[in-house]
Amino acid sequence: MAASTAGINPYIHESWKKVLINEFTAPYFMDLKQFLVAEKSKHIVYPPGNAIFSAFNHTHFNNVKVVIIGQDPYHGPGQANGLSFSVSPGITPPPSLKNIFKELNTDLGIPIPYTGNLEPWADQGVLLLNATLTVRANTPGSHQKKGWEHFTDAVIKAVSDHKKGIVFLLWGNFAQTKEELIDKDKHFILKAAHPSPLARGAFFGCKHFSKTNKILEHQGVKPIDWRLE
């Protein structure tokens, strides 16, 4: 199995390999690997190779409770760490993430953190999934439609098919296109505007963090501690 992911990252957790084994051997994934090898020979690609599958290594398949869907990794130096909306330690939170923290503050009274590193959420079962897992430096959208969306759609479908009671947070029009992949009879879908400032504050007041925890608690599942510090 390691050979099938060589050139990208052989360190995706075994729990995911079991449910995604057909993806790693599919022709589109071979093409994606070749594309990434060519990209890396000419350009800087984010996140670093060892972080491409960070979302899966922090949130094992068996531990998924919540899924937050993003679009692309951040394309600035040092920002992307493989988790949607998250940035590496020491990096100033981008505007969308700042708005997420503002909503957390008004929803649950959680102080706005200094860090934008969301690994503590991922470690508790929040799958922070970008639809596209890589990007060329300073070139947003550059790795779209190269195969990643096929792979991450399969991830969403696998979670939907094999699990139940998962809370999917779909923020913005793009994330909401993924609703068709989710079995609404088995899972919970919460929708809101994107936290980007371009949405002119429409994200605020969604209370998705408290709503998520109420859903989890109602099922007898330990809620998420959304605090980062």
Regions picked out by a protein language model, each given a short descriptive name:
Residues 8-20:
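Generic N-terminal amphipathic, Lys/Arg-enriched alpha-helix
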Residues 10, 22-170, 174-177, 182-191, ...:
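A polyanion-binding, active-site-adjacent surface
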